[in-house]
């Protein structure tokens, strides 16, 4: 072998060794979940529920067709193939069953799961890892967070370690154990896709988003970090097909345990409440309110006699922080407020009329049901038209008092123009235009005449009791 060939040989050999070491290093970095699963599985349970429903298929003879007009042979033929009527007292009951998951958080038998797993159940059955089955008692449930606390009789039961969901970061490995489609102790894995996610109609939970495969039956089961600690409760998926599509959501264990402790001690959950309706600040709204960039929560509506009203918060305020914690998106505010107790102090940093201001108020307790404002009644006051393409009338004193409005105008007619383009409708109430409160139809017309062109202008609109700010631009 010549010297040049010998050098080439050693060069190739060295390259192969380096590549082999790199591959081995990458393989070594991949997690092994074996020990985690072995230690955690005994405390993960299968939950089955039974709900008794009335059998409404045939309840009385009024549901039977009239066969009296048929010949005897035909009548006998049809009667043989039809169910016989029963009296209402003879109605049978049928059962609806569902499956889910849960996990043990105390040695004496307390179990966490989802509210939707056990909702409306007449009987809850828990199957442990050793296949034994026990009836569970519902201690309490919180539909707003989708958390439920159960209790089974037992002692020295296996218990899961609880972590801190606030320490999670996007990109970290996570593991789920549950009973998808009834297959007990199924293990799936993935990564944290995002934290602090907000979902429609889920205002009080900053969800953990993952790509862990979650299917029917996984709900209520634990989500683990690599230390084997529970960091969340698997709750729901985003799907267009009905099956898993790579986007799943878990309730942070910090939130779940706060709910659990309140249910255990008081049977219900208390949350902080400001009494406001807020909306996202987009680019156009940021320009309209003089903000450097889209951020914060825009106050679109304030409930009469609520904490915000008593504390001096105003419609049009943009809330930038609460007790020093920044409000990057509007969805951040309900999470932070909900975590406060009634009576706690809340210091809000807001933008009002283009200037920063601090507003301090006392947090209230969230009511069982939010006040429902109905569509405002029509007024018979004289019309006023304007360059926006709407005909408006003023609110009378009775309407202002009934709906706690100091002013505003009702749209009676929408014509071709900017109003039609932004979706305004007859019956909508306009309370603010270009950050100015409207007290009369005449004032509305005057403000409309002075609106700037080619710049975002805000308008506060009340529709069916719900207020929001919208923006538009007037062309040259």
From Swiss-Prot:
GO biological process: proteolysis
Enzyme Commission number: 3.4.21.107
InterPro entries, per database record: PDZ (IPR001478), PDZ_sf (IPR036034), Pept_S1C_Do (IPR011782), Peptidase_S1_PA (IPR009003), Peptidase_S1C (IPR001940)
Binding locations of substrate: 217-219, 274-278
Domain PDZ: 263-354, 360-465
Catalytic activity: Acts on substrates that are at least partially unfolded. The cleavage site P1 residue is normally between a pair of hydrophobic residues, such as Val-|-Val
Catalytic residue positions: 116 (charge relay system), 146 (charge relay system), 219 (charge relay system)
Pfam families in alphabetical order: PDZ (PF00595), PDZ_2 (PF13180), Trypsin_2 (PF13365)
Coiled coil: none
Highest taxon listed in the record's lineage: Bacteria
SUPFAM superfamilies cross-referenced by the UniProt entry: PDZ domain-like, Trypsin-like serine proteases
Top-level enzyme category: hydrolase
Keywords per UniProt: Hydrolase, Periplasm, Protease, Repeat, Serine protease, Signal, Stress response
One Gene Ontology term of the molecular function aspect: serine-type endopeptidase activity
A GO cellular-component term linked to this record: periplasmic space
Entry function: Might be efficient in the degradation of transiently denatured and unfolded proteins which accumulate in the periplasm following stress conditions.
Family: Belongs to the peptidase S1C family.
Name this protein carries in UniProt: Probable periplasmic serine endoprotease DegP-like
